[in-house]
């Protein structure tokens, strides 16, 4: 699988847990590129920036 994981929005892909995808917007890939976002974060965008603590980031307050 391409590590950039550039799949279409709403499509389907197989992002692994170690995927460092930057453009993945497919519905089947629940993992974002920001490891500090909580699993249920609806606002979480690809490439959001973590702020210090592992549970805080720029897109999930």
UniProtKB/Swiss-Prot annotation:
Q: Where do the annotations place a divalent metal cation 4 binding?
A: 33-34, 44, 48
Which residues are noted in the entry as a divalent metal cation 7-binding?
Answer: 50, 57, 59-60
Q: Which Pfam families match?
A: Metallothio
Keyword Lyase on entry: no
Q: Which residues carry this modification: Phosphoserine?
A: 58
Give residues where N-acetylmethionine occurs: 1
GO MF terms, alphabetically ordered: metal ion binding; zinc ion binding
Quick check: keyword Cell inner membrane in the entry? Answer: no
Stretches the record annotates as Alpha: 30-61
Q: What keywords are annotated for this sequence in UniProt?
A: Acetylation, Cadmium, Copper, Metal-binding, Metal-thiolate cluster, Phosphoprotein, Zinc
UniProt: a divalent metal cation 3 binding residues: 15, 19, 24, 29
For binding a divalent metal cation 6, which residues are annotated in this chain's numbering? 37, 41, 44, 60
Can you list the GO cellular component terms from the UniProt entry?
cytoplasm; nucleus
Stated role:
Metallothioneins have a high content of cysteine residues that bind various heavy metals; these proteins are transcriptionally regulated by both heavy metals and glucocorticoids.
Q: How does it assemble?
A: Monomer.
PANTHER family under this entry? METALLOTHIONEIN, METALLOTHIONEIN-1H
The name on file for this protein is Metallothionein-1H
The organism named in the record is Homo sapiens (Human)
Taxonomic lineage of the native organism: Eukaryota, Metazoa, Chordata, Craniata, Vertebrata
């Amino acid at each position: 699988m391409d590590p950039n994981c550039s799949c279409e929005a709403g499509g389907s892909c197989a992002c692994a847990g170690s995927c460092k995808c930057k453009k993945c917007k497919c519905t089947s890939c629940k993992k974002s590129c920001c490891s500090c976002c909580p699993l249920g974060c609806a606002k979480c965008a690809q490439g959001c920036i973590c702020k210090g603590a592992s549970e805080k980031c720029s897109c999930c307050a």
